[in-house]
Each structure stands twice: as C-alpha cells, then as structure tokens.
Curated annotation (Swiss-Prot):
Stored SMART domains: YqgFc
Function: Could be a nuclease involved in processing of the 5'-end of pre-16S rRNA.
GO cellular component: cytosol
Name under which the protein is recorded: Putative pre-16S rRNA nuclease
HAMAP family for the chain: Nuclease_YqgF
Organism lineage: Bacteria, Bacillati, Actinomycetota, Actinomycetes, Bifidobacteriales
EC category: hydrolase
Keyword Amino-acid biosynthesis: no
Protein's cellular compartments: Cytoplasm
Species name: Bifidobacterium longum (strain NCC 2705)
EC numbers, comma separated: 3.1.-.-
An individual GO BP term: rRNA 5'-end processing
Main location (coarse class): cytoplasm
One of the record's GO molecular function terms: nuclease activity
Family according to the record: Belongs to the YqgF nuclease family.
Amino acid sequence: MVWLGVDLGNARVGLALSDPELTFAHPAGNIHVAGDYFFAIDEVLNVIEDEHVDHVIVGLPLQMDGTEGKSAKKARRWAANLEKRLQAESEDSDSTEYQIPQVSLIDERLTTVSAHRQLFEAHKASNKHRPVVDQQSAVVILQTALDRTREQ
C-alpha cells in the first residue's frame, strides 16, 4: 500500500510518497505546471500507475479562520477532476484488478511554513528552498495524514 501527497502550487505541484507500511512520507519531486493543472493531473496519473498508489492526499489550503478561499476552491476542483479522470481510466482499463485510488483533502494551513522550517533545520540554505519547498510541503501534508490514520 502506497499513498501520494500532493501540494498544489501556481508554478509547481509538490509530490510525496509513503513507504509501503504507511509510516513515513518522503519527497517524490515536483511537477512544473505554470498554472496548467490538467498537465498536473496527467503527471499525477502517471505517478499513481508507476507507484501503485492506493490513496491520494491533496492539501486543502484553508484560510487561517478555517474558511475556504480561492486556493481551497481550486484544490477542491482539482481533486474532483482527478477523481473523474481516475474513474474514466478505470472504465477504460481492461484489467478487472484495477482499484481506483481514494482521493482525500486535508487541511494544509501552515504546511509551507513548516516545510521552510524543516529545510532550515536540515541546513539547507534559504535561497535553495524554492525548488524543494513544494515537495517538502507535500511531505508535511502526507505525513500528517499518515499520523492521523495511525492515531485512529
């Protein structure tokens, strides 16, 4: 069993994968999208297939008061479009063994702050954060989901 964490950004989509035991999240790269979220869905579908992903966790960027702003609505639409594409892929698949991965949203408030802090603590120079902060944010999102699952 493998889970995929997704942090949607305007320029990059950060990815993280879990270990098969669903204990640890690790960075899995960025998708450079420049606002083209359909391209991001195509790339995520490739990762899902290549890594045999069972569950996709998408960060939901709520505002500090818990309400949904423009970015959260965009994340919800993106997750819904991913689910539609997964359903279509399932219907087009000849395999009866194809399992559609579950797609969930998780509150990602302050994950970027946490990601920057983790990179700083790892002695990564702050001018080198930009290329990796999205995937580190995806790690924080996914690790939060994994920890919550273990606590239940």
